[in-house]
Structure formats: structure tokens, C-alpha cells
Amino acid sequence: MAQKLDNFPYHIGREIGTGAFASVRLCYDDNAKIYAVKFVNKKHATSCMNAGVWARRMASEIQLHKLCNGHKNIIHFYNTAENPQWRWVVLEFAQGGDLFDKIEPDVGIDEDVAQFYFAQLMEGISFMHSKGVAHRDLKPENILLDYNGNLKISDFGFASLFSYKGKSRLLNSPVGSPPYAAPEITQQYDGSKVDVWSCGIILFALLLGNTPWDEAISNTGDYLLYKKQCERPSYHPWNLLSPGAYSIITGMLRSDPFKRYSVKHVVQHPWLTSSTPFRTKNGNCADPVALASRLMLKLRIDLDKPRLASSRASQNDSGFSMTQPAFKKNDQKELDRVEVYGALSQPVQLNKNIDVTEILEKDPSLSQFCENEGFIKRLAKKAKNFYEICPPERLTRFYSRASRETIIDHLYDSLRLLAISVTMKYVRNQTILYVNLHDKRKCLLQGVIELTNLGHNLELINFIKRNGDPLEWRKFFKNVVSSIGKPIVLTDVSQN
């Protein structure tokens, strides 16, 4: 899109996300305040669906988001406008990035950290439901963080009004992501109860770094086993949960929506009402630096033990489907507009006079590949904000001193072992590998691996997700990087 629009009151910066017919860009005003602005190409949108249907959906999304404005755990809606070509929606920019980018797959986060974030999630959902609004698409991609590490619920694209002026109605649109969707979603359902179910799956994922099943259908393996044990599972990884966490999760994941916990039951559960050191009286983060440090200390990629296997693989040893989706003609065009959090400018070559070691010593992503406790403690001593330790940029990246040709050869070898096909493109000083695959839950993962020369004999290799579950994308990143290993992956800032 053009960098200037008639009557658009902001300066347009870099793109941070894309959708089927929308693009999200960082924009800033004359006071340098940053916003996330969603631009919808009206011609493209109305070519994919009836113009009237699209207009109603867009109006509903905006109206319901505005209705839920004003809560600290919901992304703020500022305004919307349009011209003949574009419709734009101005939203709060979540400077802390994506919560689930900071969670280790198959490991999860510490229970007190999970309790803090789940309490904020339920505060946001309680507020939405008090307005009669069901989100209906609660999943990791829609849970963001602000600059102090507080949780923000985003994306009202599937939201619906289930209650108005004291009168409730059942909903009937089968929406949401399969691993997080309630079993009754294919029938008429209570919008508030499907949100509770999704929150239960999210809490499970926070604590254990995975979802309990592909989807809640009675003939699928993991969910069938759950049902056979009368929804009181004792097998791995359920047996890793504390009694309190087990109680609240199983209460939220009752297949019968009439027996399932309501939001009121959830927020009054003893596990959630117990104190946590991270929570202030008003529910905000009490110590952003300590919270960021705890999150980062859980992230670890052991390059001394290369592996291509997921601990709960179902398709093959890698955990990814052997039959990968073929690229469609439009896929590469869509992937050219990739999702990248961070500064308003693209990565550029570093100044020749810059001390590269000093730059790398401040990059938290390096802590994944070393004994990270000392690394994180050094950062924490100087940090004043959450994002100085947990950056908004995705952590699925690494540096290398190897030549680009060598790095690409190793990437291709690793992706071949995972049975993932790749296409490649050159853009200025970058090489971009386009990847398209299904994760072990049979959900689509799309993104790019972007190689950028920073100068100083240094390459940045960035795995940038466009579509899919952040936990599964990080698992894919770990599998690839672990198979590449040392000395390609830079683990020591003094490494030559």
C-alpha cells in the first residue's frame, strides 16, 4: 500500500501483520505515539465475499470492540475511517509482543506466572461478558502484552453479542481454532460457555506448553481418552498439574456446557483467588522486570543434544505432517507481508564503528542458546521495563558467523529431514525462505525464514510466523535450530 493516504492523520511505518485481505502496520502521530493500524483492502475483501456481508461483519467487529473499550486487559480501540480503497481501524499497539512467543513448548511457565496471566485473562473476559459480548476465538495468537507485561485480549473478528438488555440468545456459527474450540460449537451454543472452554485450554497450554488434544471431537485419540476417564484424567501430562490447577481446568473443560464452570465459578475458584507476588491490588503487574526474567529463564534450546522429535508427535518423528500443503499462487505474495514486531524500520546493516559484542550482549534472544540464568540476571540489573528483557520482537531468531550459503545449506538439510518443502526469494540484502506446513494438530503453519546480513561478518536468521499457533511455530523453530546446532548458531557473543 502507499505510504500516504488522503486524510490519514498518522505517519505509516512498517507492516507487523497480515490477513486474508488486511494488513496491520505500525503508525505514529506527531507526538511519536505508536498505534497498530489495521488496513482492509475493500476491493480485495468484497471480491472474496458479498460486499454486504463484508460490510456487516466489519461493522459488527468495530461495534463490539468499541462496546468493550476501556478495560485494561483488552486492546484499546481508538477510531476507524475509510476512503474508496481502504478501511482502517486504529488500535493500541501491544509493545510487549505475543505472550505465547515467550512460553517453552511442552514445558510451559511457572504456576504463579500462569496464575497471574490467567487472572488478567479472566478479568478481560468477565468485562466482555458483562457487555453481552462473546469473543469466540480465544487462542494464543490473540493474547498480547503491553510494555509492562500486562495481558491484552485482541481481535474481535469472530465476536458476537449473546446477551442484550438482560435477554440472552444462543449462537450458531461454528468459529474458532480447533484445538481451542468447545465441543458444542457445531450446534447452537451459549457464547459465554465456549469462551470458558477456550480459557481452560489456554490455561492448560500456559502450564504445560501444549494443548490437550487436536480438537474436542469424541472420535479423536486424546479427547476420546479424556472422555473415557470421565473427564478426570490421570495420565501424562495431566498428572503434572497441581491439585488446584487440575481442579479449575477440569471444571472449565466439562463437555456438557450445563455442567461446565461459568465465568463466576472460575473467578471465585481458590486456585485463582490465592495471592501471587506479581499482582498488585488493581490486578496489574507488580514487578515487570522480575516477571520478564521468569519468562525468559524458561526458554532453552539445547544445541548439544540435536533433536528433530516433538515429545508428543503424532504424524512422524518431527511432530509435523509428512504431507505438507502445497503453495498456492497467492501464498508467496501474502507471505511477502510478514508479521514482525519491533521497530519502525527493517533490519539494516550495522554501522562499521558499532561494537557488535555490545549489541549482542543486550539481545535477550541469545539467552536461549546458553546457560541463560547469568545472561538474564545481567540484563535485569540494568532493565527498567518488561520489554528490555522480553522484547516485542519474536524470539524465534538466531545469529550466525557462518557464510549465508553455509547457513542456507544447513537450513535446507534440516527442513528436508522434517519433510517440509521450501521456496526461496532474494530481496535486497536478504534471503527469504517460505515455509508452509501443518503442525501435529493438523493446523496450518505459515511463515518465512529471513536471513539478513548485518555487516561485521554477522547474519540474523529470523523465523517469522504469519499464520498458526505460536507454540507450534516455536516448536518448529527449535527443531530446525537444534538440528543445525553449533557452530552455525552463535551462542557466545565473543564467538568468531
Curated annotation (Swiss-Prot):
Signal peptide stretch: none
Residues reported in the UniProt entry to bind ATP: 16-24, 38
GO molecular function, one term: protein serine kinase activity
SMART domains named among the record's database cross-references: S_TKc
One GO CC annotation: cytosol
Domain Protein kinase, chain residue ranges per copy: 10-272
Location relative to the cell: Nucleus
EC number annotated for this UniProt entry: 2.7.11.1
Catalytically driven reaction(s): L-seryl-[protein] + ATP = O-phospho-L-seryl-[protein] + ADP + H(+); L-threonyl-[protein] + ATP = O-phospho-L-threonyl-[protein] + ADP + H(+)
InterPro entries: Chk1_catalytic_dom (IPR034670), Kinase-like_dom_sf (IPR011009), Prot_kinase_dom (IPR000719), Protein_kinase_ATP_BS (IPR017441), Ser/Thr_kinase_AS (IPR008271)
Enzyme category, top tier: transferase
A UniProt-annotated Pfam family: Pkinase
A Gene Ontology BP annotation from the UniProt entry: negative regulation of G2/M transition of mitotic cell cycle
Mod. after translation: Phosphorylated.
Top-level taxon in the UniProt lineage: Eukaryota
Keywords from the named record: ATP-binding, Cell cycle, DNA damage, Kinase, Nucleotide-binding, Nucleus, Phosphoprotein, Serine/threonine-protein kinase, Transferase
KW ATP-binding (keyword) present: yes
Active site: 137 (proton acceptor)
PANTHER family named in the record: CALCIUM/CALMODULIN-DEPENDENT PROTEIN KINASE KINASE-RELATED, SERINE_THREONINE-PROTEIN KINASE CHK1
Function: Serine/threonine-protein kinase which is required for checkpoint-mediated cell cycle arrest and activation of DNA repair in response to the presence of DNA damage or unreplicated DNA. May also negatively regulate cell cycle progression during unperturbed cell cycles. Binds to and phosphorylates CDC25. This leads to negative regulation of CDC25 and prevents mitotic entry.
Subunit structure: Interacts with crb2. Interacts with rad3. Interacts with rfp1.
Record family assignment: Belongs to the protein kinase superfamily. CAMK Ser/Thr protein kinase family. NIM1 subfamily.
Stated name of the protein: Serine/threonine-protein kinase chk1
